[in-house]
Amino acid sequence: MAIGKRLLVNKPAEESFYASPMYDFLYPFRPVGNQWLPEYIIFVCAVILRCTIGLGPYSGKGSPPLYGDFEAQRHWMEITQHLPLSKWYWYDLQYWGLDYPPLTAFHSYLLGLIGSFFNPSWFALEKSRGFESPDNGLKTYMRSTVIISDILFYFPAVIYFTKWLGRYRNQSPIGQSIAASAILFQPSLMLIDHGHFQYNSVMLGLTAYAINNLLDEYYAMAAVCFVLSICFKQMALYYAPIFFAYLLSRSLLFPKFNIARLTVIAFATLATFAIIFAPLYFLGGGLKNIHQCIHRIFPFARGIFEDKVANFWCVTNVFVKYKERFTIQQLQLYSLIATVIGFLPAMIMTLLHPKKHLLPYVLIACSMSFFLFSFQVHEKTILIPLLPITLLYSSTDWNVLSLVSWINNVALFTLWPLLKKDGLHLQYAVSFLLSNWLIGNFSFITPRFLPKSLTPGPSISSINSDYRRRSLLPYNVVWKSFIIGTYIAMGFYHFLDQFVAPPSKYPDLWVLLNCAVGFICFSIFWLWSYYKIFTSGSKSMKDL
């Protein structure tokens, strides 16, 4: 009995989420013969979660004349089906003009081609605008394409990352599966892709593949995957300085000068871009069409930010009316300078110390710099820094896990105004509660309400254990107090938003309050990522 107790006490140091319902649900599959089962359980549960979110409304449902992102994606499937490639980036730009790189256009073409096989009226040119089938056939098809895209691009990349890291530091298979489930159950991505409606998981999955190839030291393949990510959604450029610095350093500085490696990487990068843009040149009208594509995917004329977003420009615009005091060209320059200053230390650190265990942190610092300071940022863009942030759920450091959990909650909170507009109130609340409960954030409550017969693992039923009396909070008192304070602020905001009307003179006051809370938290987390970069240089992947 004493040995068993000693093992139970030592266990939390080995597993990331020992004190969580997720650990307990997967605990019965610890025997060697059952270790393949957790992956299938996680896979099925991740798909079910996405399906249940998809049962709700989507962006722009029943809101003519422009509707929303659902209609935008459907419209791109429509025009790529019926128009020559030379018109894809020119057609009716006042409606939902195509404004993503060619890989998104080809993806839309393929999905539209398959969808037309089931029902051509879904994508009939011009006649299908705002189409909402009474039998929900179109909605079902569109939702299923996002799930399949998740399964093909995002799921394998995440599972591979957690397995690679787990094997590197001798983590148990069950620990690897728990880390994968925490990443796959991230609520923000699920709600935007499967609720609001987008295909961000394709871009993020391709980026994760690029990260995996860096870990495996397949540098040319990493470059190819990253270019594919950029060519699907240009926001992947938020990671570009780090990938550039890492690949350059690994070619010219570490372990030694290797011109052959640099040549192969450069060729792979240029060849991938050339292959993807070649159809626009040869089938779409030459350089004129490529120029129009680039003009569409970098819409500088729209302004420094769109709607309300938790970044520097939107929050400080309350005090300094940038659009009134500066020209668009000036704002472009200022945002460029601020963004470069923000990511330059991370880029230099990557160039001088291209270490694998620093990759998540430098990617966080770089992408968060773009989110906070760059031009034309949307609230959904927080999904870009959330990828490397959420990959840190593979960490075994309690403090890292607590901060990752907290910033994921903050990110979800900043998406509330958008999700509220889409009518995704229930999905927002349930996703927040479920994701936090699964990783143990309600551990101080759970064992007091669940009988032991419903707890298959050892930790959740141990009410007296210290791990069961605390939620996922850091050890540091200052951090703990600040995080609790932000949760109180978030709760207070939701109370105001639900029960108190904003002043008629300031109708966006509550939304700006949401942005202010998010901006403060994101800025502090961004600084924390730099702290980790400069204090973790001598560590290894085992210390991630």
Swiss-Prot record:
The chain crosses the membrane at residues 36-56, 105-125, 146-166, 224-244, 264-284, 333-353, 357-377, 399-419, 426-446, 482-502, 509-529. It is found in: Endoplasmic reticulum membrane. It comes from Saccharomyces cerevisiae (strain ATCC 204508 / S288c). Pathway: Protein modification; protein glycosylation. One of its GO terms (molecular function) is hexosyltransferase activity. This is Dolichyl pyrophosphate Man9GlcNAc2 alpha-1,3-glucosyltransferase. It is a multi-pass membrane protein. Keywords: Endoplasmic reticulum, Glycosyltransferase, Membrane, Transferase, Transmembrane, Transmembrane helix. It is an enzyme of class 2 (transferase). Dolichyl pyrophosphate Man9GlcNAc2 alpha-1,3-glucosyltransferase that operates in the biosynthetic pathway of dolichol-linked oligosaccharides, the glycan precursors employed in protein asparagine (N)-glycosylation. The assembly of dolichol-linked oligosaccharides begins on the cytosolic side of the endoplasmic reticulum membrane and finishes in its lumen. The sequential addition of sugars to dolichol pyrophosphate produces dolichol-linked oligosaccharides containing fourteen sugars, including two GlcNAcs, nine mannoses and three glucoses. It comes from the Eukaryota. Residues 1-35, 126-145, 245-263, 354-356, 420-425, 503-508 are cytoplasmic. Residues 57-104, 167-223, 285-332, 378-398, 447-481, 530-544 are lumenal. Its EC number is 2.4.1.267. Signal peptide: none annotated. One of its GO terms (biological process) is aerobic respiration.
